[in-house]
């Protein structure tokens, strides 16, 4: 197994997000439908959001670059470069307060 440069991947995905009509891009770093553990690098251009959705299992966000706000029924949580956020097991959304890249880690239920 080769090492993966998260910095290079983050740069590439952020460039893709900036050029995308929806203002976001994603790349599965590890896992997939057949794995309980999934890690996805998400890039969002400033002002873009992931609409409210259910938490698919235990989940965390690591902010690789930028600043994001995780919105939940218990209130918003802001995170900047280097911050680690545990996503509560409830409906939530994510907003990029500036161009941002996060690593989403999920362990699926069941």
PLM features: what roles do these ranges have?
Residues 1-36, 71:
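A short, N-terminal "cap"/entry segment at the start of jelly-roll beta-barrel domains
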Residues 23, 38-55, 81, 89:
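Conserved short histidine dyad/triad with adjacent acidic residue
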Residues 50-52, 70-71, 92-97:
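Short beta-strand His + acidic residue motifs that chelate non-heme Fe in jelly-roll/DSBH
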Residues 57-73:
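Glycine- and acidic-residue-biased ligand/ion/polar-headgroup-sensing regions
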Residues 64-65, 80-81, 98:
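A cytosolic small-molecule/anion-sensing beta-strand core signal
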Residues 73-90:
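Short acidic-glycine-tyrosine-enriched beta hairpin
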Residues 89-110:
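Ligand-binding loop in jelly-roll beta-barrel domains
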């Amino acid at each position: 197994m080769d090492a993966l440069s998260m910095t290079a991947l983050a740069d590439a995905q952020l460039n893709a997000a900036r050029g995308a009509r929806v203002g976001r891009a994603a790349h599965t770093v590890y896992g997939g439908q057949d794995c309980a553990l999934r890690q996805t690098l998400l890039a969002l251009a400033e002002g873009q959001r992931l609409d409210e959705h259910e938490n698919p299992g235990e989940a965390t966000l690591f902010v690789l670059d930028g600043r994001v706000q995780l919105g939940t029924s218990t209130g918003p949580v802001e995170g900047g470069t280097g911050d680690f956020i545990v996503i509560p097991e409830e409906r939530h959304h994510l907003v990029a307060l500036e161009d941002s890249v996060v690593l989403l880690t999920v362990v699926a239920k069941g």
